[in-house]
Amino acid sequence: MTTKTSCGDFVQFFRSWVSDPLRVAAVAPSGERLARLMTQEIEPLDGPILELGPGTGVFTRALLTRGIPESALTLVEFGEEFAVRLRGRFPEARVVQMDAAQLGQCGLFEDAPFGAVISGLPLLSMSPAKIEAIVGGAFETMKPGGAFYQFTYGPRCPISRSILESLGLKGTRIGGTVRNIPPAGVYRISRQNPLEISTGGSKYRRAEDNTGIGAYATEAGKADMGRPEASA
């Protein structure tokens, strides 16, 4: 299965960027080389896998190429236009339309912990409180040894040292590519002590409550829970 981006995907992505540049934060979908970097450490036994901000599904296809069953994927996407296409393109995956900042509060992911999280979210365009809510919530849904993979267009880890330390996490750069628009680096975020579950939950919940973000989750057949500010 190829991870190359079709012309139709590019057009949809570009239109979404034009309509909401802060939410999409890139003029084109991620490239094939970046998709390989983002998923290079993922193995079939790591499932189930959570993907945040999958957009047109570039990283999703790379996960399938790595041998992850489609049924083991949960795709969290805020944009309705992307969520609709993802449901049609990956019918066996669980597609949830929601703000990723609500991961630790929505109660949708308590049935089985994830082995890893792949994030295509534009963290550089988000507030520190929102980043902490997303990352903290993601680690609440993960197995103790799970890792959070994030790419960035910046020169350093997009999650600040203060946020990492408050959640008991560490960031490690695992690669980069100039063959992407724009060039990007990839970081693995993991627990400082894999045997301990992050204890930062109450802190990041309070931070997000102060920003007035409400819960929002729409899955095929599920009702709205209130619309938040834009994220993925």
Predicted region positions:
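SAM/dcSAM-binding transferase cores
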Residues: 10-17, 40, 161-232
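Conserved class I S-adenosyl-L-methionine
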Residues: 46-55
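A short acidic, Gly/Pro-enriched loop at the edge of an enzyme's catalytic core
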Residues: 106-117
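A short glycine-rich, Lys/Arg-flanked "PGG" loop and its adjoining helix->strand segment in the class I
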Residues: 132-144
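Conserved beta-strand signature within the Rossmann-like core of class I S-adenosyl-L-methionine
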Residues: 142-153
